[in-house]
Amino acid sequence: MNGDAGRIATGEPVTATTPSTRRSLPPLVEPGPELGREEVARYSRHLIIPNVGVTGQRRLKNARVLCIGAGGLGSPALLYLAAAGVGTIGIVEFDDVETSNLQRQVIHGRSDVGRPKADSARDSILAINDGVTVRLHETRLESSNAVQLFEQYDLILDGTDNFATRYLVNDAAVLAGKPYVWGSIFRFEGQVSVFWEDAPDGRGLNYRDLYPEAPPPGMVPSCAEGGVLGVLPGTIGTVMATEAIKLVTGIGEPLLGRLLIYDALAMSFRTVTLRRDPGRVPVTELVDYEAFCGIVPDAAASARSAVTPSELRRMLDEGRDLALIDVREPVEWEIVRIDGARLVPKDRILSGEVLADLPQNTPIVLYCKTGIRSAEALEVLVRAGFSDATHLHGGVIAWAQQVDPSLPVY
């Protein structure tokens, strides 16, 4: 080895030659109280870093950081922020721990299944650092509470996995005048950036500069639909925690105005420069974000458009003539399926390529994992004239829970 790589390997100090120190932002938080004897011992590896030191650690101690979600991204971010000595950590989370979470949400354990995620996350944080004040907000983040909640904190971390909440977080952060760290994961790839409309150096950007409009519903699958490599949120969540620490202490160059893209399969990181959209409409109020993102398909809004698992069971038991269509992906079909179903992935319905092959005069029942993708496919069928089409409310998960408990749930 030679160069910087060799010097790092042998422990020789390496001086950074990047312009990062010239682009640092002022520290977000003023120093808190003096450190106690135990705190000096705990954070000693921070204290001997010149750029952090005692003052930086006191800033962390005085910081109030709010994490939206205690799931895949929130788990590592919360654990490392607690270990780093962030004084007050808020958690917005209203879900319970499920078995499928354990593959990636490392803040929760097997014994936590069925518990509120907020409670589980709090216990894990305090087990690492009982000097942290943990505030739980066990509620859904909504337009009615977001700004008021954000105003109580110095910095926000967005660990959510849907576009409606991401736009809500962004707009609320803009109105509250708060910076926030955003992360996103899917299968083998992740992204991280920092958004701060009121950044003091004039580089202010927000999420709408990256995504002016939400993609059409269903175009970008969630982790529940498309899957995610279990270790991926560990990488991205840790980067998010790093950005939070940099903002609080004022060290380094934050990802403000840059998008970090990580490819786990290629083991590569790259950054893309972001610029303010000159045509972006200023954020002046919070709106209905589910409507903004088009989350609820018109065809699925009517109660007549869905059947319950028990209703479908009765239809099948009575031998009714119907076409049961599974709109999930082939890999999901291999995990679990409803007997008698035919696999027709949603994208083939949305593209219209299979419409001619579907029966016009036979009732059609669509299903997916939870009912979201089947509702999207149903909207296309209704527009195409399939008047006797419906979908399974709750999808194959509800079927397994209510009709056939022997089936696996994923």
Explain the meaning of each model-derived region.
Residues 2-3, 11-27, 130-143, 147-148, ...:
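E1/E1-like adenylate-forming module used to activate ubiquitin-like modifiers
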